């Protein structure tokens, strides 16, 4: 069967695009499974600890003996969905297979800990070991998996026919991974990205969408949202009732969103200067349309890195007053210890990755999707391997996963700039980054900031997101939402499980912040709306027509660039 509904939010967290930190997507995903220097250090470390290593292997042998005798008490955790079928524990043979698998996995994990590697080598080795363990799970084996065997009996083997067809289709074109969502259930502009609005500015780089107010009164200062550049913009405008943009305009906040054009090889030279310049153009257009000299601005993931650099440029040129408020959504500006991806990166690979994207003229979003899936294969490869191929069923219907599959390309120039920015941690040191002829110093961005992170986010870990409170020069309000990455943002008030943590202070240490944080039940969307309301001026009558300041509607939302392939 398709993954249970309760698991969709978790899968969405893990399926969100990486954008910036996945700096080596161009080199291909399976390269990570090849032994490297970290693997050699691991082997040497174990060889230098023969007593400890021997004790671990002896314990494994003893446990395997207990498994064979039927006296082992090993059992998979209840939360491990791979072994939820009662047959895994009720069938004597299957129980022994699972117990042997668990025993070997625990021993491997203990050996990695025994090696006492530094944090980077430890993460690299654990990545390899955990991924191999996921691949070798008995749940991935046809007929050994009891659900697969039952499906074969019930359908007279038709499940394997359907699964084989799906496998051939998925492997025929990028990304060569199991399909994660039933894309036939969604259509952009029909049941997703449907909040009414119009394109009021179109350049070769972007379309600017103004959303139609849905209240009689609106706040005079509008909000501009800057999305990532490797997926389409509508993560903030998903299905009705789950759209942040819809929520904003239904509550009196004027909203604009950038929709990036999908670049091709001809646009290879577009770099950070190009995209910051485009955001400046959009910001100017927002102010013209609304007849104001200020706007609030926020971004999402890597889009917020571009927005942050734009804010730094405004500060350097004496125009920061144009920003009434600033937001950072699941964004890492300080890449110190930036999680697994930071550990996996190395200079040689980064140079090769930039060379590959330069030859193509772009980084293909499908390569990025494939690489990201192999970062969490247990959930993003093997989960769907079982559902799609062994059971012969369709993947789930879920709007975030549909958005995630709708990838775009990133220009070679921007790819190289993101790689250098992340690896050299340029935003941490004032003046290390120069954009449009100005040195960027984020401490000069003293606009009030609203930051959101996901507590389960392994792409942009919340502790790394929190460090932005120390980089920016203004007063920050930090929100720690449930879930991870994009699912932390798609958190409407109708979600009964929604909650978030907040504190009145922002100490330097994120763990100290957590100790003082209070848990609020419900969505953080109303909190953000109230925060914006305090900074977005007085209410005024909503405009009757879209456009203004010499800009007129060019097309209905969601525009035309969102359909580029």
Locate predicted features.
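Cap/lid segment of the alpha/beta-hydrolase catalytic domain
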Residues: 215-289, 339-340, 492-509
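Alpha/beta-hydrolase fold nucleophile elbow
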Residues: 283-303
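Short beta-strand/loop motif that positions the catalytic acidic residue
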Residues: 451-453, 457
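Amphipathic, low-complexity, repeat-rich surface-exposed segments
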Residues: 1-207, 218-219, 256, 321, ...
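Alpha/beta-hydrolase-fold enzymes
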Residues: 117-154, 161, 288-292, 306, ...
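Short alpha-helix in the alpha/beta-hydrolase fold that links the catalytic acid
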Residues: 461-471, 482
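Mobile cap/lid helix-loop segments that gate and shape the active-site cleft of serine hydrolases
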Residues: 404-440, 447-448
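Histidine-bearing beta->alpha loop at or near hydrolase active sites
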Residues: 262, 456, 481-500, 504-507, ...
């Amino acid at each position: 069967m398709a993954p249970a509904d309760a698991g969709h939010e978790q899968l969405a967290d893990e399926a969100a695009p990486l954008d910036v930190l996945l700096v080596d997507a161009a080199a291909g995903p399976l390269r990570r499974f090849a032994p490297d220097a970290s693997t050699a250090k691991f082997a040497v470390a174990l060889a230098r600890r023969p007593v400890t290593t021997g004790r671990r292997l002896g314990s494994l042998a003893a446990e395997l003996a207990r498994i064979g005798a039927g006296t082992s008490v090993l059992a998979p955790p209840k939360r491990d969905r791979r072994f939820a079928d009662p047959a895994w524990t009720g069938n004597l043979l299957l129980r022994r297979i699972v117990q042997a698998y668990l025993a070997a996995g625990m021993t491997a994990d203990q050996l990695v800990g025994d090696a006492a590697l530094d944090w980077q080598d430890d993460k690299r080795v654990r990545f390899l070991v955990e991924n191999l363990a996921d691949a070798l799970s008995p749940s991935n084996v046809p007929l050994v998996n009891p659900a697969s065997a039952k499906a074969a009996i019930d359908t007279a083997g038709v499940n394997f026919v359907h699964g084989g067809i799906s496998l051939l289709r998925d492997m025929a074109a990028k990304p060569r991974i199991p399909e994660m969502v039933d894309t036939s259930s969604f259509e952009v502009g029909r049941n997703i990205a449907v909040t009414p609005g119009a394109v009021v500015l179109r350049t070769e780089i972007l379309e600017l969408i103004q959303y139609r107010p849905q209240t009689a009164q609106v706040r005079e200062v509008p909000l501009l949202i800057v999305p990532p550049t490797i997926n389409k913009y509508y993560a903030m405008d998903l299905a009705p009732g789950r759209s942040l943009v819809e929520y904003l305009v239904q509550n009196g906040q004027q909203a604009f969103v950038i929709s990036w054009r999908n670049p091709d090889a001809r646009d290879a030279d577009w770099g950070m200067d190009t995209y910051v310049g485009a955001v400046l153009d959009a910001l100017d257009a927002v102010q013209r349309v609304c007849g104001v000299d200020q706007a609030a601005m926020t971004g999402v993931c890597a889009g917020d890195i571009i927005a942050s650099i734009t804010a730094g440029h405004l500060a350097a040129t004496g125009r920061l007053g144009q920003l009434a408020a600033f937001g950072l959504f699941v964004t890492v500006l300080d890449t110190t210890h930036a999680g697994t991806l930071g550990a996996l990166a190395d200079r040689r690979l980064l140079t090769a990755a930039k060379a590959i994207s330069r030859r193509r003229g772009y980084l293909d979003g499908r390569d990025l999707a494939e690489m990201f899936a192999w970062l969490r294969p247990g959930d993003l490869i093997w989960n769907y391997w079982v559902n799609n191929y062994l059971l012969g069923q369709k993947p789930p219907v879920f709007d975030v996963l549909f958005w995630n599959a709708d990838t775009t390309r990133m220009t070679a120039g921007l790819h190289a700039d993101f790689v250098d920015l992340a690896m050299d941690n340029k935003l941490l040191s004032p003046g290390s980054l120069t954009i449009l002829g100005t040195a960027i110093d984020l401490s000069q961005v003293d606009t009030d900031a609203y930051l959101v992170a996901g507590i389960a986010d392994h792409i942009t870990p919340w502790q790394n997101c929190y460090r932005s409170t120390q980089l920016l020069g203004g007063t920050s309000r930090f929100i720690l939402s449930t879930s991870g990455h994009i699912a932390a943002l798609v958190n409407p008030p109708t979600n009964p499980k929604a909650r978030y943590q907040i504190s009145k202070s922002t100490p330097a240490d994120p763990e100290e912040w957590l100790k003082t944080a209070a848990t609020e039940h419900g969505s953080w969307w109303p909190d953000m709306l109230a925060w914006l309301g305090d900074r977005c001026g007085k209410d005024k009558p909503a405009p009757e027509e879209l456009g203004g300041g010499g800009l007129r509607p060019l097309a209905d939302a969601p525009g035309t660039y969102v359909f580029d392939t």
